[in-house]
Swiss-Prot record:
GO cellular component terms attached to this protein's record: cytosol
Domain of life: Bacteria
Reported function: Could be a nuclease involved in processing of the 5'-end of pre-16S rRNA.
Name this protein carries in UniProt: Putative pre-16S rRNA nuclease
CDD domains: YqgF
Enzyme Commission no: 3.1.-.-
Subcellular location per the Swiss-Prot or TrEMBL entry: Cytoplasm
Transmembrane segments: none
SUPFAM superfamilies found in the cross-reference section: Ribonuclease H-like
Enzyme class: hydrolase
Organism of origin: Opitutus terrae (strain DSM 11246 / JCM 15787 / PB90-1)
Annotated Gene3D superfamilies: YqgF/RNase H-like domain
């Protein structure tokens, strides 16, 4: 299993990679200005890494409804299913992952870091790690004898 985590945005696409070891690692975000080039870079990354699973962040509202961003993520997932046939595409609840990722960066650095896509890739890492943790839960400790 080779997974690519995706935090899809209108200006940047955060990426993370993980496998059966169960550890998500951030990759450089896709920050091309042209959305078509960003999309092609996403497809190229998935092909180069020979991923078996794509994990797309699904930004549901706090009341579990799907707003415009969630519907956009659903459309992205559907397009990925079409363009990368044979790759499983999963939508994973990503509520507050961008805020959590941003909280790890000092306030003075956030503007520069946001433009570089670091926050987006950290969010993708959190999304993918959640998926991997569900797939590969840590073993329970052995009972003391």
């Amino acid at each position: 299993m080779r997974c690519l985590g995706i935090d899809y945005g209108t200006r940047r696409i955060g990426l993370a990679y993980g496998d059966e070891l169960g550890v998500a690692t951030p990759l450089p975000a896709l920050v091309e200005a042209d959305p078509a080039k960003r999309w092609q870079s996403l497809l190229a990354t998935a092909r180069q890494r020979r991923v078996t699973d794509l994990v797309v962040g699904h930004p549901l509202n706090m009341d579990d409804t799907a707003g415009p961003k969630a519907k956009e993520a659903e459309a992205v997932a559907a397009r990925l299913r079409t363009e990368l046939a044979g790759v499983d595409v999963h939508l994973v609840d990503e509520r507050l992952t961008s805020y959590e990722a941003e909280a790890t960066i000092s306030k003075t650095q956030r503007r520069a870091v946001r433009a570089s896509g670091v926050i987006d890739s950290r969010a993708a890492t959190l999304i993918l790690q959640d998926f991997l943790d569900q797939r590969f839960p840590p073993p329970l400790p052995h009972p003391a004898e």
